[in-house]
A protein has these predicted regions:
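Residues forming the flavin
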Residues: 1-663
Length: 663
């Protein structure tokens, strides 16, 4: 006979303010099989857990139902409490009466009635629960970092420092990411290259770190502790083991007019190139779209001048397969495409530039050697207008993103300050909606731009930019003075919104990781697990999870590394016992379950069965690897014969819940 105990949590006032918890406990106490029911302000507290353990012993409970918050919050807490009292942890059910009840209802009577129904369903299910025992699986002591920007670099360095092997996969020819294109960092105006390049070199020289530059993740299989990853190393047409990075090939290549993506198309490069002087690895790459030798078999200059014999025109993509215990997504961001905003004339005038393009124009290693010149005629601009929030904080009717990009206010202040410092005769205007400076020393930095450098900050919107007579006619509004402004500018700089890298969606699909509506990776919990994805063993680092500046990115990178280290320190992991279980007598070998399994946990075997008249039959049936199965339940839905069931969530248990709800 089942002996169920019910414990209703107030969660302070989170539940109790909307749900009559006393009535819920009293009502559920009369359900069949329930021998004890009570309520308490905080069931997750030590006192609450002690109460559960005491009542298990006192009433010889065979099952426990906790009416509280989401099982994602405290299911493990309550399972461990019950296990200490000698009750199998899988004889515990959580009725979510906070997120699914009190938080979404205002009427107390309705919320209370719903809480009773949810509790009744949990009671019906727990009576059909069976004790489950978790198995173990070994942990591969190696980590994969997808993305080689500052987030990926810091994550890899921290993991390697703990003594674990780590691979960085970067799709571009060099690691470093967007930070390599930045001149100075706010609010201290440190040289970005002086901070970043030593870390890049550390990665290259660290024996525990292997860099797969100019490579992409092809596929991901397996599960936490045992991921199987295929990496595509794209053909550089240069042997990395032979190339010395001398640059002779890049100097002699006759194809000189290739748009230079590192300088955002503000100048050109050769068909064979090294992105920038401090690139890691410092290895040349041949651009197959522009190389005459690869396109029509004519040229070969780079091979002739390469004394190391590193040029290999026949090189092909290669696939590398590797096992990993943990994966970190550090895929970074891209500025939003600005040509969609016609009002700013970005695609009509070369003197309307993005903030990152302006960064390159101010950089000593940029296309103009750090001299600020207009792209159209090479003249020094006397009047510059900065426009904030281009593509950020847009409502549903506007083009762009609905979120704040977080870094635009600060880097615009930096650009304006550096411009005034270097060219005091330049008039600088900044049009803004709000100035957001929440970081340490950020507000002081912004005030310096206004008070010390005389930058004109105007609260208002730029309505239109019109190229006319060699000038940019800026039409804008000043909301504080309630007037319209017309400024003849020489340059307009647009603070472009940032969005996730284009590869993020495909990477998330391979990792079975969740994403929000803006294609940022979703964390397991925004407060308690901010660097973990809901997929076990997959962690988040940097702007793949949301907009952030460099200090915040580095901090999150180290936090993600700490989580990875904690995982790799273990010799084995406890497996989820709630795995799929096929009924071999009902299985017809159709492969439907195998096709939908995202983890590759299902295979098919030929098995002997005893037939009529002592005959032997060979039938093809499904077999589940419990170490790989993550208990998602996709196979149970797909199975046409009903042969596949899920431990802990069987069809019988789910129907018992449905019947209880409909009662």
């Amino acid at each position: 006979m089942q002996r169920i105990g019910v414990f209703v949590c107030h969660c302070g006032t989170n539940i109790a303010a909307t749900v009559d918890v006393e009535r819920v406990a009293e009502t559920l106490g009369h359900e069949p099989g329930v021998v004890f029911a009570t309520h308490y302000p905080y069931m997750c507290s030590q006192t609450g857990q002690d109460m559960i353990r005491e009542k298990i012993a006192e009433y010889a409970l065979t099952g426990v139902v906790i009416c509280s918050c989401s099982p994602r919050m405290h299911e493990q807490t309550f399972r461990k409490a019950c296990e200490k009292a000698g009750l199998n942890g899988y004889m515990v059910e959580i009725a979510n009466i906070r997120e699914q009840c009190s938080w979404i209802h205002k009427d107390k009577e309705e919320a209370t009635e719903k809480a009773v129904i949810l509790g009744r369903a949990a009671i019906a299910k727990v009576q059909l629960n069976a004790p489950l025992t978790a198995g173990t699986s070994p942990v591969t002591k190696r980590a994969l970092v997808i993305g080689g920007g500052i987030a990926g670099i810091q994550t890899a360095l921290d993991i390697a420092e703990a003594g674990f092997e780590v691979d960085i996969v970067e799709k571009k020819p060099t690691i470093g990411g967007k930070m390599t294109q930045i001149d100075k960092t706010f609010p201290t105006l440190d040289c970005a290259a002086c901070i970043l390049t030593p870390k890049m070199v550390d990665c290259a020289q660290n024996e525990k770190i292997h860099i797969y530059a100019y490579s992409e993740v092809e596929s991901v299989g397996g599960f936490v502790g045992n991921f199987h990853v295929k990496i595509r190393r794209k053909a550089r047409f240069v042997d990395e083991t032979k190339c010395t990075g001398c640059g002779a090939c890049t100097e002699k290549c006759p194809q000189k007019k290739v748009p230079n993506e590192f300088n955002l198309g503000l100048d050109t490069r050769r068909a064979i190139y090294i992105p920038f002087a401090q690139a890691v690895p410092k290895v040349a790459t041949i651009d197959a779209d522009y190389c005459n030798m690869l396109k029509n078999g004519k040229c070969g200059v780079c091979a002739k001048v390469c004394t190391a014999g590193a040029i290999d025109y026949k090189q092909q993509d290669t696939i590398i397969e590797q096992e990993y215990g943990a994966i970190v997504a550090a895929t970074g961001f891209d500025p939003i495409k600005l040509d969609q905003f016609d009002e700013f004339a970005y695609s009509k005038s070369p003197d309307v530039v993005s903030s990152l393009e302006f960064e390159r124009l101010m950089n000593a290693a940029g296309p103009t050697g750090g001299t600020l010149l207009r792209p159209s005629d090479g003249a020094h601009p006397k009047t510059i207008v900065f426009v904030q929030c281009v593509g950020s904080r847009c409502d549903g009717a506007q083009k762009g993103k609905n979120y704040c990009s977080k870094i635009c206010c600060m880097y615009t202040a930096k650009h304006a300050m550096l411009c005034r410092e270097k060219y005091p005769d330049t008039d600088v205007y900044v049009f803004y909606i709000d100035v957001r400076t929440p970081g340490k020393l950020f507000d002081e930095f912004y005030r310096r731009a206004v008070e010390e450098y005389g930058v004109h900050y105007i609260k208002g919107m730029v309505g239109k930019v019109v190229p006319e007579g060699g000038k940019l006619k800026v039409q804008a509004s000043d909301l504080l003075d309630n007037r319209q402004l017309h400024i003849d500018a020489d340059m307009v700089v647009l603070a472009a919104a940032i969005e996730p890298d284009k590869s993020a969606r495909s990477i998330a699909t391979m990792l079975t990781a969740s994403m929000d509506t803006n294609d940022f990776f979703t964390e397991a919990h925004p407060k308690l697990r901010p660097v973990e994805s809901p997929t076990a063993g997959v962690f988040l680092s940097g702007t793949c999870q949301g907009p952030k500046d460099i200090p915040e990115t580095v901090a999150q990178a180290s936090a993600a590394a700490a989580k990875v280290i904690g995982l790799l320190c273990k010799d084995s992991l406890t497996c989820n016992p709630c795995t799929a279980q096929p009924d071999e007598m009902m299985c017809n070998g159709c492969s439907s379950c195998e096709k939908v399994c995202p983890y590759g946990a299902i295979t098919y075997i030929d098995k002997e069965f005893r037939g009529p008249n002592r005959t032997t039959l060979i039938r093809r049936v499904a077999q589940v690897n419990p170490a790989v199965c993550q208990g998602c339940g996709a196979c149970t839905v797909a199975c046409p014969s009903g042969a596949m069931d899920l431990k802990g969530f069987s069809n019988k248990q789910i129907m018992a819940e449905v019947d209880a709800i409909c009662r």
